[in-house]
A protein has these predicted regions:
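A feature for loop-to-transmembrane-helix boundaries and adjacent hydrophobic helices
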Residues: 1-242
């Protein structure tokens, strides 16, 4: 809700219809959940091939943020085309709010004691100067042994907060249209690539190839490529404030 209200204020300021984002969310949220589940099932197909009915049991866990983002972005693109609104304009407006949602959402991993990293010492966690109530809850069972683990949820949450501040600063620069959105993709993907390397519950493509890291690299290359293309080849004059 906080992320929506934050985006809604900017959307109205930038000339979008007052009900535009609400209508978009009606479609984007369900599609994000569905695609997040599909992404997870594809990566974990061996767990579902014998019992396909388990695919619909989302309440048992098993969704992936990259799948959710892909589903949401594709839905938003189609929605914007139907409404005759620039997708990149909407993406620029909502990018900071996506980081707000992701930053808050990672605390769900803390509550569920999931998506954590590998083993570390308590002394290491104390050296990070994080509250004891977080440290105490990072004492979990890992491979049958109780140990302290990396609070990867916190790393990503803080990374997203920093990214939020950067994107809000970039708004004032009045970059070319789409560059705030592409900046979001680059920033989030860099953080996710390195944080993913610490996690113990990664989805794998093959062998030791973590899917989130592969997707992050592809996303960075795509975003950088789009910035270069729009600036130097397409030479667009559209700006964030247009």
């Amino acid at each position: 809700m906080l992320a929506y209200l934050f985006a809604q204020r900017e959307a109205v300021k930038r000339g979008l219809p007052e009900d535009f984002l609400a209508d978009l969310l009606i479609w984007a949220v369900p599609m994000a959940i569905i695609s997040a589940r599909i992404y997870y099932v594809i990566m974990k197909w061996e767990n579902y091939s014998d019992n396909p009915i388990d695919i619909i049991k989302v309440w048992e866990g098993g969704i992936a943020i990259h799948g959710a983002l892909i589903g949401a972005f594709v839905t938003a693109y189609i929605f914007c085309r139907i409404k005759g609104v620039s997708f990149l304009k909407v993406a620029d407006i909502t990018a900071p709010s996506i980081l707000i949602g992701q930053s808050i959402g990672r605390w769900g991993n803390f509550v569920n004691q999931e998506a954590h990293g590998g083993p570390v010492s308590r002394e290491f966690l104390e050296s990070l100067m994080i509250p004891n109530w977080i440290i105490d809850n990072m004492y979990v069972q890992l491979n049958g042994v109780m140990t302290y683990v990396h609070p990867t949820f916190l790393y990503e949450s803080l990374w997203n907060v920093i990214g939020l501040v950067i994107l809000l600063m970039l708004r004032k620069v009045n970059l070319k249209r789409g560059e705030i959105f592409f900046g979001y993709i680059i920033w989030y993907s860099i953080g996710r690539f390195f944080i993913e390397g610490l996690r113990t519950d990664s989805l794998y493509l093959i062998a030791e190839l973590r899917s989130a890291q592969v997707v992050s690299i592809i996303a960075i290359v795509f975003a950088v490529g789009m910035i270069i293309y729009r600036r130097f080849i397409q030479k667009t004059n559209e700006r964030y404030t247009d």
